[in-house]
Amino acid sequence: IQILKDIFRLGVPASLSMVIMSMGLFLFNWILGSSDTVSASDAVAAYQTAGRIEHLFFLPIISIATSLVTLVGMFYGAKRFDLIYSIIKYGLSRSIGISLTFSIFFIFFSQKIIPIFTNSSEIIRLSVLYFSIMGFAYPFIAVGMTCSRIMQGLGIAYPMFILTLFRVVIISASLAWYFVIILGKPIHYAWFGTLISCILTACVSLLWLRGILKRVNKIELKVS
Protein backbone atom coordinates (compact mmCIF):
# COMPACT_ATOMS: atom_id res chain seq x y z
CA ILE A 1 0.00 0.00 0.00
CA GLN A 2 2.81 2.40 0.85
CA ILE A 3 4.42 1.74 -2.53
CA LEU A 4 1.14 2.57 -4.27
CA LYS A 5 0.86 5.77 -2.26
CA ASP A 6 4.37 6.77 -3.30
CA ILE A 7 3.60 6.02 -6.95
CA PHE A 8 0.47 8.18 -6.86
CA ARG A 9 2.25 10.90 -4.88
CA LEU A 10 4.91 11.19 -7.58
CA GLY A 11 2.82 10.29 -10.61
CA VAL A 12 -0.35 12.33 -10.15
CA PRO A 13 1.34 15.78 -10.17
CA ALA A 14 3.24 14.81 -13.33
CA SER A 15 0.00 13.68 -14.99
CA LEU A 16 -1.79 16.87 -13.97
CA SER A 17 1.09 18.87 -15.44
CA MET A 18 0.43 17.25 -18.82
CA VAL A 19 -3.26 18.16 -18.51
CA ILE A 20 -2.31 21.77 -17.82
CA MET A 21 -0.02 21.81 -20.87
CA SER A 22 -2.90 20.61 -23.06
CA MET A 23 -5.20 23.19 -21.53
CA GLY A 24 -2.62 25.91 -22.14
CA LEU A 25 -2.34 24.91 -25.80
CA PHE A 26 -6.12 25.17 -26.14
CA LEU A 27 -6.16 28.61 -24.48
CA PHE A 28 -3.36 29.90 -26.70
CA ASN A 29 -5.10 28.70 -29.86
CA TRP A 30 -8.27 30.45 -28.72
CA ILE A 31 -6.43 33.69 -27.90
CA LEU A 32 -4.54 33.71 -31.20
CA GLY A 33 -7.72 32.89 -33.09
CA SER A 34 -9.47 35.84 -31.42
CA SER A 35 -6.85 38.39 -32.47
CA ASP A 36 -8.08 41.26 -34.64
CA THR A 37 -4.63 42.14 -35.98
CA VAL A 38 -4.02 39.08 -38.19
CA SER A 39 -5.96 36.24 -39.76
CA ALA A 40 -6.98 33.68 -37.14
CA SER A 41 -5.98 30.77 -39.36
CA ASP A 42 -2.55 32.29 -40.06
CA ALA A 43 -1.92 32.99 -36.38
CA VAL A 44 -2.83 29.47 -35.26
CA ALA A 45 -0.96 27.89 -38.18
CA ALA A 46 2.19 29.89 -37.40
CA TYR A 47 2.00 28.92 -33.73
CA GLN A 48 1.55 25.24 -34.56
CA THR A 49 4.29 25.27 -37.21
CA ALA A 50 6.74 26.84 -34.77
CA GLY A 51 5.65 24.34 -32.13
CA ARG A 52 6.47 21.40 -34.41
CA ILE A 53 9.93 22.79 -35.12
CA GLU A 54 10.42 23.46 -31.40
CA HIS A 55 10.35 19.73 -30.76
CA LEU A 56 13.96 19.67 -31.93
CA PHE A 57 14.76 21.64 -28.78
CA PHE A 58 12.42 19.85 -26.40
CA LEU A 59 13.54 16.29 -27.19
CA PRO A 60 17.07 16.51 -25.69
CA ILE A 61 15.91 18.67 -22.78
CA ILE A 62 13.11 16.25 -21.89
CA SER A 63 15.57 13.36 -22.17
CA ILE A 64 18.00 15.00 -19.74
CA ALA A 65 15.25 16.06 -17.34
CA THR A 66 13.64 12.61 -17.33
CA SER A 67 16.95 10.83 -16.77
CA LEU A 68 17.64 13.12 -13.82
CA VAL A 69 14.53 11.80 -12.07
CA THR A 70 16.02 8.29 -12.09
CA LEU A 71 19.61 9.27 -11.30
CA VAL A 72 18.81 11.76 -8.54
CA GLY A 73 16.28 9.35 -7.01
CA MET A 74 18.79 6.50 -7.10
CA PHE A 75 21.57 8.52 -5.46
CA TYR A 76 19.15 10.02 -2.93
CA GLY A 77 17.94 6.57 -1.92
CA ALA A 78 21.53 5.36 -1.59
CA LYS A 79 22.41 8.46 0.50
CA ARG A 80 25.13 9.36 -2.01
CA PHE A 81 24.67 13.09 -1.56
CA ASP A 82 27.97 13.91 -3.24
CA LEU A 83 26.74 12.29 -6.44
CA ILE A 84 23.40 14.09 -6.18
CA TYR A 85 25.09 17.49 -6.29
CA SER A 86 27.42 16.52 -9.12
CA ILE A 87 24.64 15.06 -11.29
CA ILE A 88 22.48 18.15 -10.69
CA LYS A 89 25.31 20.44 -11.82
CA TYR A 90 25.97 18.23 -14.82
CA GLY A 91 22.31 18.06 -15.86
CA LEU A 92 21.69 21.78 -15.46
CA SER A 93 24.85 22.80 -17.28
CA ARG A 94 24.17 20.47 -20.21
CA SER A 95 20.54 21.58 -20.45
CA ILE A 96 21.52 25.24 -20.49
CA GLY A 97 24.27 24.58 -23.04
CA ILE A 98 21.93 22.73 -25.38
CA SER A 99 19.20 25.35 -25.01
CA LEU A 100 21.61 28.19 -25.80
CA THR A 101 22.69 26.35 -28.94
CA PHE A 102 19.09 25.97 -30.07
CA SER A 103 18.35 29.60 -29.17
CA ILE A 104 21.10 30.82 -31.48
CA PHE A 105 20.06 28.35 -34.18
CA PHE A 106 16.38 29.31 -34.16
CA ILE A 107 16.95 33.06 -33.89
CA PHE A 108 19.34 33.21 -36.83
CA PHE A 109 18.18 30.36 -39.06
CA SER A 110 14.40 30.08 -38.55
CA GLN A 111 13.76 32.12 -41.72
CA LYS A 112 15.49 29.35 -43.68
CA ILE A 113 13.83 26.43 -41.87
CA ILE A 114 10.18 27.51 -41.81
CA PRO A 115 9.73 27.75 -45.63
CA ILE A 116 10.35 23.99 -45.71
CA PHE A 117 7.01 23.51 -43.91
CA THR A 118 4.84 26.23 -45.51
CA ASN A 119 4.66 28.48 -48.55
CA SER A 120 2.54 31.16 -46.89
CA SER A 121 4.53 34.38 -46.50
CA GLU A 122 2.36 35.48 -43.57
CA ILE A 123 2.82 32.21 -41.67
CA ILE A 124 6.56 32.38 -42.34
CA ARG A 125 6.67 35.97 -41.06
CA LEU A 126 4.74 35.15 -37.87
CA SER A 127 6.78 32.00 -37.21
CA VAL A 128 10.08 33.85 -37.63
CA LEU A 129 8.76 36.52 -35.26
CA TYR A 130 7.85 33.77 -32.80
CA PHE A 131 11.38 32.36 -32.78
CA SER A 132 12.94 35.82 -32.55
CA ILE A 133 11.14 36.21 -29.21
CA MET A 134 10.97 32.66 -27.89
CA GLY A 135 14.61 32.02 -28.73
CA PHE A 136 15.46 33.97 -25.58
CA ALA A 137 13.13 31.78 -23.50
CA TYR A 138 14.70 28.39 -24.19
CA PRO A 139 17.46 28.56 -21.54
CA PHE A 140 14.84 29.48 -18.94
CA ILE A 141 12.55 26.67 -20.10
CA ALA A 142 15.46 24.24 -19.75
CA VAL A 143 16.17 25.44 -16.21
CA GLY A 144 12.52 25.19 -15.16
CA MET A 145 12.02 21.70 -16.61
CA THR A 146 15.29 20.38 -15.20
CA CYS A 147 14.74 21.78 -11.71
CA SER A 148 11.20 20.40 -11.48
CA ARG A 149 12.42 16.93 -12.49
CA ILE A 150 15.29 17.10 -9.99
CA MET A 151 12.78 17.85 -7.24
CA GLN A 152 10.68 14.92 -8.42
CA GLY A 153 13.75 12.70 -8.14
CA LEU A 154 14.17 13.91 -4.57
CA GLY A 155 10.66 12.61 -3.85
CA ILE A 156 8.86 15.96 -4.06
CA ALA A 157 6.61 15.99 -7.14
CA TYR A 158 4.12 18.78 -6.46
CA PRO A 159 6.52 21.60 -7.50
CA MET A 160 6.31 20.28 -11.06
CA PHE A 161 2.53 20.72 -11.05
CA ILE A 162 2.63 24.13 -9.39
CA LEU A 163 5.39 25.45 -11.66
CA THR A 164 3.56 24.25 -14.78
CA LEU A 165 0.32 25.85 -13.59
CA PHE A 166 2.20 29.06 -12.77
CA ARG A 167 3.98 29.21 -16.14
CA VAL A 168 1.25 28.05 -18.53
CA VAL A 169 -2.00 29.36 -17.06
CA ILE A 170 -1.40 31.97 -14.38
CA ILE A 171 1.30 33.96 -16.21
CA SER A 172 1.58 32.99 -19.89
CA ALA A 173 -2.09 32.57 -20.84
CA SER A 174 -3.16 35.48 -18.64
CA LEU A 175 -0.63 37.88 -20.17
CA ALA A 176 -1.46 36.68 -23.69
CA TRP A 177 -5.16 37.25 -23.03
CA TYR A 178 -4.50 40.71 -21.56
CA PHE A 179 -2.18 41.86 -24.35
CA VAL A 180 -4.04 40.42 -27.34
CA ILE A 181 -7.70 40.44 -26.27
CA ILE A 182 -7.94 43.34 -23.83
CA LEU A 183 -5.33 45.73 -25.24
CA GLY A 184 -5.69 44.59 -28.86
CA LYS A 185 -1.94 44.25 -29.35
CA PRO A 186 -0.38 42.20 -32.20
CA ILE A 187 -0.11 38.48 -31.54
CA HIS A 188 3.62 38.56 -30.88
CA TYR A 189 2.76 40.20 -27.54
CA ALA A 190 1.35 36.81 -26.54
CA TRP A 191 4.82 35.37 -27.04
CA PHE A 192 6.32 38.13 -24.94
CA GLY A 193 3.95 36.93 -22.22
CA THR A 194 5.31 33.41 -22.62
CA LEU A 195 8.88 34.72 -22.42
CA ILE A 196 8.08 36.56 -19.19
CA SER A 197 6.44 33.45 -17.70
CA CYS A 198 9.46 31.29 -18.58
CA ILE A 199 11.87 33.73 -16.92
CA LEU A 200 9.78 33.97 -13.75
CA THR A 201 9.26 30.19 -13.57
CA ALA A 202 12.99 29.53 -13.94
CA CYS A 203 13.75 31.92 -11.08
CA VAL A 204 11.09 30.37 -8.84
CA SER A 205 12.21 26.81 -9.65
CA LEU A 206 15.85 27.60 -8.87
CA LEU A 207 14.92 29.16 -5.53
CA TRP A 208 12.62 26.24 -4.73
CA LEU A 209 15.32 23.69 -5.60
CA ARG A 210 17.84 25.62 -3.53
CA GLY A 211 15.55 25.41 -0.50
CA ILE A 212 15.05 21.67 -0.97
CA LEU A 213 18.78 21.08 -1.36
CA LYS A 214 19.36 22.88 1.95
CA ARG A 215 17.09 20.31 3.59
CA VAL A 216 18.97 17.53 1.81
CA ASN A 217 22.22 19.00 3.12
CA LYS A 218 20.87 18.82 6.67
CA ILE A 219 20.00 15.15 6.14
CA GLU A 220 23.53 14.58 4.84
CA LEU A 221 25.01 16.12 7.99
CA LYS A 222 22.86 13.87 10.17
CA VAL A 223 23.84 10.76 8.20
CA SER A 224 27.53 11.63 8.33
What are these regions (language model features)?
Residues 14-26, 62, 94-103, 107, ...:
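Hydrophobic alpha-helical transmembrane segments in multi-pass membrane proteins
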Residues 22-50, 56, 74, 112-121, ...:
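Helix-terminus/linker motif at the lipid-water interface of multi-pass membrane proteins
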Residues 47-110, 141-163:
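Small-residue-rich hydrophobic transmembrane alpha-helices
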